[in-house]
């Protein structure tokens, strides 16, 4: 039995010096496997007298159990250490600083539209909306632009077929409002419009805000005062404003509105092409034909209308020189307007 005690001591020492689970497995096979040292000792029982076999067999089983117990304990220690290391690697260190969440903000075009709407609703205008897919009648015919009219060449239109198109302005909303509502009418019509044009100052899709007022005894002075006050409030400064005679099929008389350049205060710069003036919108008195086709008597009621591009006003207010920047979805650009 001295040989048995020596094998157990060797096994326990080997287990103690094992460096990992793979080493423990090799030790198990060496001592407890089918051809292991302790297994071979068990096979020698047949060489012993019958009366000694039970006692020796019991001693061998105790030795095997002892080695197995130490192996399992050592293996459990390795597994626990491995699990602890894995959990430590995967845990979240709550003492580290957080990544932080940047707050979002409204898009500059949305800000501009809200600013325009806020002014006009404050002075009694309502907000009107209409379809972006429009018919030819409301986009052109009802606005005094018949099929043969040369003004149609001013609109690079996206047509679906001969009668349906993407609206080129929000004026059809004014027509639909006049068809369904009797004067007095005071509305602004913000929305997306579409024209086949793309460069640093034009986009195939852009936002337009048009306004309409129809009532008795309305004249150009009312229009002029409304626009001058709007520009003063929108740009938050006193600006010189001028009205240049122009032509639109749906207004008569018509005018282009220029204001003092916000970049150079009228001194002349690259933005205003050294003129000191910037064009900001078109306007005019509603043409009698437009009122008549909408079911309103032009002898009793008069009206004025105006239209402006939201992108154009945003470019001037924020000093942006390329309209396409508004639609590039570049967070570095948009973050400036939070």
From Swiss-Prot:
Gene Ontology cellular component list: cytoplasm
Compartments it resides in: Cytoplasm
Single GO BP term: phenylalanyl-tRNA aminoacylation
InterPro entries: aa-tRNA-synth_II, aa-tRNA-synth_II/BPL/LPL, Phe-tRNA-synth_IIc_asu, Phe-tRNA_ligase_II_N, Phe_tRNA_ligase_alpha1_bac, Phenylalanyl-tRNA_Synthase, tRNA-bd_arm
Gene3D superfamilies found in the cross-reference section: Bira Bifunctional Protein, Domain 2
Gene Ontology molecular function terms on file: ATP binding; magnesium ion binding; phenylalanine-tRNA ligase activity; tRNA binding
Keyword vocabulary terms for this entry: Aminoacyl-tRNA synthetase, ATP-binding, Cytoplasm, Ligase, Magnesium, Metal-binding, Nucleotide-binding, Protein biosynthesis
Bound cofactor: record note: Binds 2 magnesium ions per tetramer.
Enzyme class, broadest EC rank: ligase
Main location: cytoplasm
Record field: catalytic activity: tRNA(Phe) + L-phenylalanine + ATP = L-phenylalanyl-tRNA(Phe) + AMP + diphosphate + H(+)
Enzyme Commission designation: 6.1.1.20
Cofactor: Mg(2+)
Chain sites annotated for binding Mg(2+): 252
Name of a matching Pfam family: tRNA-synt_2d
SUPFAM superfamilies: Class II aaRS and biotin synthetases (SSF55681), tRNA-binding arm (SSF46589)
Assembly notes: Tetramer of two alpha and two beta subunits.
Entry's family note: Belongs to the class-II aminoacyl-tRNA synthetase family. Phe-tRNA synthetase alpha subunit type 1 subfamily.
Protein's UniProt name: Phenylalanine--tRNA ligase alpha subunit
